């Protein structure tokens, strides 16, 4: 990684503004999944052990620049305290005189969680005044929020113009793993691209076609490719305006010598529900009033074989509507193949793919699960992420 890390800077006795991703699911004022809080612990613990005064800043939900009582970070601060085993204080604002007064009472190693940065309209606009107000609180800026690195916001980009800016350990690991996968991959290198829409994955497919040995397509976006081959897709998801693009991707794969895998059979249903009538049909025989909602058995076996013969697999997007058990077998088959492939380094690109491996209880069998859905996607597209660009070079 060519960016400075938290280890490249002396933080003892200094106030550190650390941007983390604590955008966690909540119910009845309690954190229901603390994965993202745990992911930030190594950086937080390191900063406290080094004697920094640690300010933690995060967004939670989408309050749209207004205070929303149920999106305060109070329950998050409480959960962090339990996980870290020490008192964690909470501020009622994210900047200003009251916060400065609290900071003046902090001792080395203390932690103060600032209020939800998205309560301020300037955050998502990357407002220079808000950026400066955040910077005025601290001596050093650490960004450990890879999940928000694709956003040019005040707390992810603007603040870095005013302070020494370095990466936390989570950010560093994400950039190293994803960077190595794209610049110097072990081969055979396989990418699995799923999810609902071709339009969301155009950039990543274009980028990966230049790098991979095998490209596997699944999920709702597959049916635009099926249609491009001249088959009818019934009531399945279809982007009419992307059919020509799908054809061009298949042509480019052929030109580049990339093995392009698409479903050969699919699970179709007469209704979008768990108790729908379902059957597996060849991809060329989808009934006109049925909808394909998962890959079929033959396709599952083919995809599993490709995975097991790969040295590196990057996975972004499910194979079907895995949230409904009846349509989860394809996504589960991919997750299980990755879990069983001992010689394969597996990179799960956040978002739905990460949720799927969690759901199937296979998360601990994956080599790396990215904490950023949108960020990992943009990184794999070859885009420079604003939150990374803003950090100091080594």
UniProtKB/Swiss-Prot annotation:
Binding residues for substrate: 21-23, 36, 59-62, 118, 151
GO annotation, biological process: gluconeogenesis; glycolytic process
Phosphothreonine PTM sites in chain numbering: 299
Chain sites annotated for binding ATP: 201, 323, 350-353
Superkingdom of this protein's organism: Bacteria
Disulfide bonding pattern of the chain: none
Enzyme Commission designation: 2.7.2.3
Phosphoserine sites (modified residues): 183
Pfam families in the cross-refs: PGK (PF00162)
InterPro entries: Phosphoglycerate_kinase (IPR001576), Phosphoglycerate_kinase_CS (IPR015911), Phosphoglycerate_kinase_N (IPR015824), Phosphoglycerate_kinase_sf (IPR036043)
GO molecular function, one term: phosphoglycerate kinase activity
Cross-referenced PROSITE patterns: PGLYCERATE_KINASE
Keyword tags: ATP-binding, Cytoplasm, Glycolysis, Kinase, Nucleotide-binding, Phosphoprotein, Transferase
Subcellular location: Cytoplasm
Main localisation: cytoplasm
Recorded catalytic activity of this chain's protein: (2R)-3-phosphoglycerate + ATP = (2R)-3-phospho-glyceroyl phosphate + ADP
Protein's pathway: Carbohydrate degradation; glycolysis; pyruvate from D-glyceraldehyde 3-phosphate: step 2/5
Similarity comment: Belongs to the phosphoglycerate kinase family.
Assembly and interaction partners: Monomer.
Protein name (Swiss-Prot/TrEMBL): Phosphoglycerate kinase
Species, as recorded: Bacillus licheniformis (strain ATCC 14580 / DSM 13 / JCM 2505 / CCUG 7422 / NBRC 12200 / NCIMB 9375 / NCTC 10341 / NRRL NRS-1264 / Gibson 46)
Source organism phylogeny: Bacteria, Bacillati, Bacillota, Bacilli, Bacillales
Gene: pgk
């Amino acid at each position: 990684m060519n960016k400075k890390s938290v280890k490249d800077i002396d933080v003892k006795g200094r106030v550190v503004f650390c941007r983390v991703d604590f955008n966690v699911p909540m119910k009845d004022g309690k954190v229901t999944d603390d994965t993202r809080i745990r992911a930030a612990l190594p950086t937080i613990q390191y900063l406290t052990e080094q004697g920094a005064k640690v300010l933690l800043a995060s967004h939670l939900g989408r309050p749209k620049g207004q205070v929303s009582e149920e999106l305060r970070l109070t329950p998050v601060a409480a959960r962090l305290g339990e996980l870290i085993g020490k008192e964690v204080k909470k501020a009622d604002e994210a900047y200003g005189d009251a916060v400065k007064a609290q900071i003046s009472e902090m001792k080395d190693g203390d932690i103060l969680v600032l209020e939800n940065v998205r309560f301020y309209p300037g955050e998502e606009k990357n407002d220079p005044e808000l950026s400066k107000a955040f910077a005025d609180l601290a001596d050093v800026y650490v960004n450990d929020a890879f999940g928000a690195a694709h956003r040019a916001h005040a707390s992810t980009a603007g603040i870095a113009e005013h302070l020494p800016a370095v990466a936390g350990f989570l950010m560093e690991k994400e950039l190293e793993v994803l960077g190595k996968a794209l610049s110097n991959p072990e081969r055979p290198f396989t990418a699995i691209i799923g999810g609902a829409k071709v339009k969301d994955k155009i950039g990543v497919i274009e980028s990966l076609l230049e790098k991979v040995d095998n490209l596997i397509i699944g999920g709702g976006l597959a049916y635009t490719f099926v249609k491009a081959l001249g088959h009818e897709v019934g009531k399945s998801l279809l982007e009419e305006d992307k059919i020509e693009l799908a054809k061009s991707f298949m042509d480019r794969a052929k030109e580049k010598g990339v093995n392009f895998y698409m479903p050969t059979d699919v699970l179709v249903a007469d209704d979008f529900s768990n108790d729908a009538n379902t059957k597996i049909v060849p991809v060329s025989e989808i009934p006109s009033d049925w909808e394909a909602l998962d890959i079929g058995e033959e396709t599952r076996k083919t995809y599993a074989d490709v995975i097991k013969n790969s040295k590196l697999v990057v996975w972004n997007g499910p194979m079907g509507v895995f949230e409904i058990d009846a349509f989860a077998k394809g996504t589960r088959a991919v997750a299980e193949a990755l879990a069983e492939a001992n010689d394969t380094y597996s990179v799960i690109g956040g978002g739905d793919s990460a949720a799927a491996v969690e759901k199937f209880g296979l998360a601990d069998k994956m080599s790396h699960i990215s904490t950023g859905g949108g960020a990992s996607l943009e990184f794999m597209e070859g885009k420079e992420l604003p939150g990374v660009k803003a950090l100091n070079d080594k």
